[in-house]
Amino acid sequence: MPDNVALFATTILILPMFYLLLAAPAFLLVKLNVTPVARLLRGMFNSYFIVLTIAGVIGTAAVVMTGRWGLAIGFGLMTALAATSRRWFLERMNFDIEQEAIDADVAHRMRRLHWGGMLANAVQLAAVIACIPYISVAPA
C-alpha cells in the first residue's frame, strides 16, 4: 500500500523542479547581455532555490511526522543542497545590474551558469522521480 504522506512530500518537492525544467530553456533563445533579461534569469533561479528550499522543509517535516527517518534524511539533504546551491549560484551570477549593457564575458559566464543550473535541476528531478517507486512503498 502506498504511503500517502511520502507521495505528497515527493510531489511538493517535484513541483518547483518541474517548473524550472519548463521555464529555464526559454532563456536559451535570448541574449543574456541585455540587463533586464539577465535580471529576469537571476530572479528566476533565485525564486526557484527559495521555493525548492521551502518545499523541502515542508516535505521533510511531513515525513518526519510519520517517523520515516531514512526518507527524512534524504529530503533534508535535498533541502540543504537547495539552500547552499542558491548561495553558491547567485554569488557567481551577481554582476553590476545598473549597467546599461552587460559585456560579453559576463554574458558567457551567465550562459554557462544557466546550462549548469538546468543540468543540475534535471539530474535532481530524474533522481527524485526514479525513487518514487521505492519511496511510496517503503516500510516505516
Give the label of every model feature segment.
Residues 1-140:
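Polytopic transmembrane helical bundles with strong interfacial aromatic enrichment
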